[in-house]
Amino acid sequence: MEIVIRQTPSEVSSTVADIVEGYVRRGPATLGLATGSSPLGSYRELARRHRESGLDFSDARAFLLDEYVGLPKSHDQSYFSVIRSEFVDHVNLDTDRVLSPNGESPDIAEEGARYDAAIAEAGGVDVQLLGIGTDGHIGFNEPGSALTSRTRVKTLTEQTRLDNARFFDSVDDVPHHVLTQGLGTIGEARHLVMIAFGKGKAEAIAAAAEGPLSAFCPASVMQLHRHVTVVIDEAAASKLQLADYYRYALEHKPSWQSF
């Protein structure tokens, strides 16, 4: 696991965009896209590079981490619609090459296995972007999730539904269930890139990177992965015991060694 500490959120977003751009330019790339606030700056930077420098996404494809159950794909709060408005519609990535779990599947219990099979058929994900919750969750893998879990249906906590109600007309409109890639599915991506900002994420980052491997902190499963880059700002790094070493290692990173 490589931990990259940047001074500001904008520097974090730029570094993450550099990583994604490398895969896109080497192409064809299969991207794992996350929603939420953490990757937004990186999406904006990638869109700028497409607009101003011709960064070409036409050969790329993408898989989403999760999707609401029972919400039409066309609904403005489906994660498919959200990722379109935040990123896909701003680059030349064909929406037919962007896949999400089918929250309206007539056989919702089997949809997770179908989605995992689709990822495998595409050759797997090259680079997966991830945020992290204050409790260490990634995707909708809340504390207690099996570290080898596959894409499956999860029940949203009442607090999560209340938190998400601001995006809907009322809390009654927020779905109770979501399809999410499991920790095992996420871990099959060849490169995991975690993004975090602010003191509010500092304890979660410390637990994920330096704490024990435990279902209590789902993101700690990254410790077992062969290629992880955690890109954070100084505030999110404030609880790391080895922060000085991570800064030293980055400063002396060999010129031939990429992220």
Curated annotation (Swiss-Prot):
Pathway the protein acts in: Amino-sugar metabolism; N-acetylneuraminate degradation; D-fructose 6-phosphate from N-acetylneuraminate: step 5/5
Molecular-function annotations in GO: glucosamine-6-phosphate deaminase activity; identical protein binding
One GO BP: N-acetylneuraminate catabolic process
EC number assigned by the record: 3.5.99.6
Reaction equation(s) it catalyzes: alpha-D-glucosamine 6-phosphate + H2O = beta-D-fructose 6-phosphate + NH4(+)
Keyword match Hydrolase: yes
CDD domains in alphabetical order: GlcN6P_deaminase
GO cellular component: cytoplasm
Protein origin, superkingdom: Bacteria
Role: Catalyzes the reversible isomerization-deamination of glucosamine 6-phosphate (GlcN6P) to form fructose 6-phosphate (Fru6P) and ammonium ion.
Database matches in NCBIfam families: nagB, PRK00443.1-4
Family the entry assigns: Belongs to the glucosamine/galactosamine-6-phosphate isomerase family. NagB subfamily.
Protein's name according to its UniProt entry: Glucosamine-6-phosphate deaminase
